[in-house]
């Protein structure tokens, strides 16, 4: 389940936001003042407004105005993209591998510069009207060359559309896209220039691009000024309300959003001013993949607000495109929202209890689908983890930020993305400038202990911060099983009771080498094995298998997985001892106990083994279970997407400590108490320059670079075996827009203030600034 949270908007696009680092000009681009517009108050002598639709008992799941950076703008039948605006990010994957210098200035105006001599954008087309259609088209680009004697070759879906001379003065250039070149879905537009010059910041650029428009060929050249979509106070019949407004007499504002079950749209419709009959038609439409678009409302644009409550019907629960269309007149769309029937917001107990003892039981390499509580069909026996889950709050969709130990543990302990903590390769180290949970809690009076059987979680990689005791059994050449780890930790904990303590228990099972005890392996392999796999050598052998130096049969593959499954059941038994000891010590019902993992392991779901080199669900989806007696409900399942970096701010709240504003994650406690299953939340996995994984509601996007996108439906296809990107353009466009926003702001995103990239708050516009640069990305280099 999940929660949606809820000036000017720039043309085009449907799911975007953000910025990264520089100061502002954004204040001119996105004016946050409409957020302050009060509830509408009638002006004296105004005509009576239509009775508003009854939304009592409904809660807002998605506020279209707050999410205005996700708006895709069409004017007079054309998709309009302002490249100097935040919404440009959704068309260029946030600048990742699409070769743009974002958030720049050209001749005093916001623009994006071509990074070098070539760049690309991806523009959506559909067949539902009021925008570009499949077939031939007219592509209009407003730009100026930064180099003399410039030429640019333009390609649409890698087919040449023409080569033109580009002047040094800003000018619009119209190019005819040949018949049958535009198709439903995203269309790649690539610009390749002849030469580039040096620009500030040590970069080179061929041209400054200010606007892109795409329309059907029959429309010809667009008018000189297509205008922009605004989010502001609109006066209809003397009543002022916050609204989305598109100028002119033909517009379409589209959003690509994942609708919750039983979703409705609430919106007020009216023509600005006091004219008795502004004229024209207002239309609200919903479209989902594989189905014709459905009109939810069509009626005249009136001189009074007409408040609507529209049932999304079968589109609810799916990725959808919502269109707000004006034909023959200008429309103001007041307070447009996705709403659902739901009880009022809940609140935690008051005063909220805080805890003196915090224990994190980290299970290395534990896939969520190998625990019965997460996957009732699994053969793996985990009775103790399952019993704990039933006695705690379980987060059904926890996503790790890295797919091997170093970056993933680092995100959990710092509350930031890998691009910020920089611990992403064997030769890298945790940045000393990022927050660290042990230091935070030590400052608040906690005794802090690290007990780790993972060699990466050590001083060599920068983890020796804030611990009163810091033991790494790999580095100390000591036994590293969870039994020895807990025995050592218990000996340190016991004399300190009842003092405040935070203990991080980084167990190694079921990480390779896969060496389960015989009684646990026997549950999954009950016959002789005569193949090449040696349990004690399985870690080295996985590397040989990946490198093609060790050939394995289906029987060998099955044996490998049986070894892994046996390790998990062994871990489950050791966890039972940990819980029994906490109870015997008299602290179990006074403590926070958390079970998490840093990543999973793959067993040929996508052609390989081990971890650290993909962003599919078998590596990114892990257990997260929190027991906080008297605060978090027992047996509750939270179906919203959450990130492992949310753990650090959650621990701070549970301890009663002050939140650290440098942490990019957000405490999960408020989510538990406002968990109504309606709002999409974004969860990101980073594999350096290799891939990005994004989970939002039922979909996972795997992005390996421009034109290399895979999309999976986690409900219909939990093992991610069928890539549906080609025949789900609506779902793909929405996911791509969220990822573009998040990538551009990866180093500055703050979930506590901005929400998630799938559902932005008003605070984003006040503090984000214009899009900037990530700078040099940290290297990636996990187990291969």
Language-model-detected regions and their locations in the chain:
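Bacterial N-terminal signal peptides that target proteins for export
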Residues: 1-10
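C-terminal motif of bacterial Sec signal peptides marking the signal peptidase cleavage site
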Residues: 17-19
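Catalytic domains that recognize anionic headgroups
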Residues: 21-24, 29-109, 144-147, 152, ...
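Extracellular ectodomain segments of secreted/surface proteins
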Residues: 111-131
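Short histidine
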Residues: 166-176
């Amino acid at each position: 389940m999940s929660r949606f949270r809820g000036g000017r908007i720039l043309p085009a696009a449907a799911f975007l936001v953000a910025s990264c680092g520089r100061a502002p000009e954004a204040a001119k681009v996105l004016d946050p003042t409409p957020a302050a517009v009060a509830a509408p108050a009638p002006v004296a002598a105004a005509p009576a407004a239509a009775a508003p639709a009854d939304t009592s008992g409904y809660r807002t799941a998605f506020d279209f105005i707050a999410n205005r950076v996700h708006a895709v703008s069409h004017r007079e039948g054309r998709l309009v993209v302002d490249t100097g605006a935040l919404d440009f990010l959704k068309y260029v994957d946030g600048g990742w591998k699409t070769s743009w210098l974002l958030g720049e200035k050209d001749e005093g105006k916001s623009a994006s510069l071509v990074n070098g001599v070539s760049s690309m954008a991806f523009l959506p087309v559909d067949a539902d009207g009021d925008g570009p259609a499949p077939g031939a088209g007219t592509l209009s680009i407003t730009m100026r060359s930064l180099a003399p004697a410039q030429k640019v070759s333009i390609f649409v879906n890698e087919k040449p559309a023409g080569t033109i001379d580009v002047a040094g003065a800003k000018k619009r250039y119209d190019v005819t896209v040949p018949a049958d070149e535009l198709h439903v879905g995203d269309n790649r537009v690539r610009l390749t220039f002849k030469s580039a010059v040096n620009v500030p910041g040590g970069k080179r650029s061929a041209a400054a691009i200010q606007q892109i428009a795409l329309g059907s060929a029959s429309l010809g050249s667009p008018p000189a000024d297509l205008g922009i979509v605004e989010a502001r106070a609109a006066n209809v019949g003397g009543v002022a309300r916050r609204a989305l407004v598109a100028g002119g007499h033909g517009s379409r504002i589209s959003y690509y959003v994942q609708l919750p079950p039983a979703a409705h749209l609430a919106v007020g419709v009216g023509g600005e001013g006091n004219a008795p009959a502004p004229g024209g038609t207002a239309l609200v439409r919903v479209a989902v993949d594989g189905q014709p678009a459905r009109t939810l409302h069509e009626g005249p644009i009136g001189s009074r607000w007409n408040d609507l409550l529209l049932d999304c019907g079968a589109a609810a629960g799916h990725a959808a495109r919502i269109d707000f269309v004006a034909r023959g007149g200008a429309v103001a769309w007041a307070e447009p929202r996705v709403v659902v029937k739901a009880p009022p917001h809940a609140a935690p107990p008051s005063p909220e209890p805080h805890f003196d003892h915090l224990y994190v039981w980290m299970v290395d390499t534990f896939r969520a689908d190998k625990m019965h509580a997460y996957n009732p069909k699994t053969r793996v026996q985990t009775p103790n983890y399952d019993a704990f889950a039933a006695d705690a709050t379980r987060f059904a969709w926890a996503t790790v930020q890295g797919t091997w130990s170093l970056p993933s543990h680092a995100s959990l302990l710092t509350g930031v993305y890998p691009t910020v903590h920089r611990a992403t390769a064997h030769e890298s180290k945790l940045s000393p400038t990022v927050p660290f949970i042990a230091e935070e809690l030590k400052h608040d009076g906690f005794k802090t202990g690290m007990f780790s059987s993972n060699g990466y979680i050590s001083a060599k990689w920068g983890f020796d911060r804030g611990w009163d005791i810091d033991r790494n059994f790999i580095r100390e050449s000591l036994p590293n099983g969870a039994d020895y780890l807990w025995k050592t930790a218990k000996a340190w904990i016991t004399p300190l009771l009842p003092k405040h303590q935070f203990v991080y228990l980084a167990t190694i099972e079921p990480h390779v080498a896969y060496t389960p005890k015989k009684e646990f392996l026997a549950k999954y392999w009950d016959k002789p094995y005569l193949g090449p796999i040696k349990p004690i050598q399985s870690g080295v052998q996985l590397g040989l298998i990946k490198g093609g130096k060790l050939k394995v049969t289906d029987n060998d593959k099955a044996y490998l997985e049986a070894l892994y499954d046996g390790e998990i059941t062994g871990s489950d038994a050791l966890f039972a001892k940990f819980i029994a000891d906490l109870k015997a010590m008299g602290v179990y019902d006074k403590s926070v106990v958390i079970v998490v993992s840093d990543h999973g392991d793959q067993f040929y779901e996508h052609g390989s083994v081990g971890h650290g080199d993909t962003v599919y669900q078998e590596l990114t989806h892990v257990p997260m279970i929190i027991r906080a007696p008297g605060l978090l409900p027992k047996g509750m399942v939270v179906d919203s997407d959450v990130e492992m970096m949310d753990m650090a701010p959650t621990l701070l709240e549970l301890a009663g400590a002050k939140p650290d504003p440098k942490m990019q994650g957000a405490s999960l406690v408020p989510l538990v108490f406002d968990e109504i299953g309606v709002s999409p939340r974004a969860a990101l996995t980073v594999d350096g320059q290799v891939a990005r994984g994004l989970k939002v509601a039922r979909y996972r996007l795997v992005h390996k670079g421009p034109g290399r996108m895979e999309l999976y439906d986690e409900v219909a296809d939990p093992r991610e075996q069928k890539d549906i990107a080609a025949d789900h353009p609506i779902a793909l466009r929405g996911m791509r827009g969220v990822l573009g926003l998040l990538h551009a702001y990866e180093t500055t995103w703050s979930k506590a203030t901005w929400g998630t990239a799938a559902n932005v708050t008003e605070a984003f516009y006040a503090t984000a600034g214009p899009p900037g640069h990530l700078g040099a990305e940290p290297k990636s280099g996990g187990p291969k």
